[in-house]
Every structure is written in C-alpha cells, then in structure tokens.
Amino acid sequence: MEHEISNRNGVSLMYKKNDDQIDFKLNLEIINNHVYMDTFIDFNIFKLIETLNTDIIECIYMEQTDTLDTMNICMVLKPIGKEFGLSQKYILSRTTKLQSVHNVQFISSDLKELSAIKLNVKAEPVKKNSANLNIDIMSRFHLNVTYSFNLELETELPIYMEKLPGQLIQKMFIRLKTFLENISS
C-alpha cells in the first residue's frame, strides 16, 4: 500500500515498501503563464536538475546512444551519509524519451557498465534502479508531472534512513518546480 510521506511546496512524495524493494512516487504541477513549459521537456532537463542541486549532485554525465531518443546517463551523488558509513553512490541508467502530442515520458532502466563515461571520483553504483518521468502537457503553460522510481543500494540502510532517497529526489523536484514557475520570458 502506498503512503504519502510528505507534501512540500506542492510536491507530494509517496512511498511503498515490498520486502527489500522500496518504490517512491512524486506528483507535482508546474504552472507558469509567462513561459512555454513544453520547451523544457528534453534531455537537458537533467542538466537543469544538476545545476539546481549542486549540494546533492556532484555531476551528471550524458552519452548519446545510437538513437536520438536514448541517452546513457550517469548521476554522481555527493557523498551523503558518509558519517553513517555509507559510500558515495552513482546512478547509471539508459533513458529513452517517448513523446506523443500531450505527453512525454523518460523511461530509465538499469545500465551495468559505464562505457565511454569516466568517473573521477571513487563512488559505488546503485545496485538496481528504474524510473519513469511522466509529463502530461495540459497546456503550453501547465505540466502535470509524475516521477516513479526505485533504487536498491548495495549497503543496507538503517530503517530510519530508508526514506532518504525519496526525500532527496523530492528536494530536487521542489527546486525544479520553483525555478520553472518563477522564470519569466
């Protein structure tokens, strides 16, 4: 059963735990009557998230694949929780963009090796990850966003920290929402 952990700044964070797997889901609306929101819906949104979250994300590497609608993305997180014995992590995924008239999805699945991406930090990969960033285009000025994801870490998190990945992603999306709603043309 899904439970709402928090709703901060219009970004709702849901949580569901089944055995060892934890699923998170964010829901939010982004409205700005001064800027066409649909112009932000491409792979550069990940670079914008990086720019807005330098305290959480060390860097994001993006590598074009053979198809224009698919990228290999490596998100290196800052060393969060090292005082609790947690190592620095990175999330490596193959992300495909699917687009229709009023909807864009970025579907990410686990990628096991880095290929051309060279990390200059000592970080460990997240064991397993998947995500779906679903953006419904209500109008050029209004987006409904749902981000569903799960992460399986090599290291077992203490019970009081198991919601931390969701809370960090929620913080990233609060900043994205705030930025997009406050820019002007």
Language-model segments: residues:
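Hydrophobic ligand-binding cavity/cleft-lining segments
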Residues: 1-72, 83
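Beta-strand/loop substructures that line and gate deep hydrophobic ligand-binding cavities in soluble
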Residues: 92-95, 107-166
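Short, highly charged C-terminal tails/helix-capping segments
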Residues: 178-185
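Hydrophobic pocket/interface hotspot
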Residues: 36-40, 48, 94, 147, ...
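Short coil/turn motifs at secondary-structure junctions
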Residues: 31, 80, 152-154
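Coil-to-beta-strand transition motifs
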Residues: 19-23, 101, 140-144
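Glycine-rich portal/gate segments that line the openings of hydrophobic small-molecule binding cavities
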Residues: 19, 29, 59-119
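C-terminal functional regions of eukaryotic proteins
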Residues: 164, 168-178
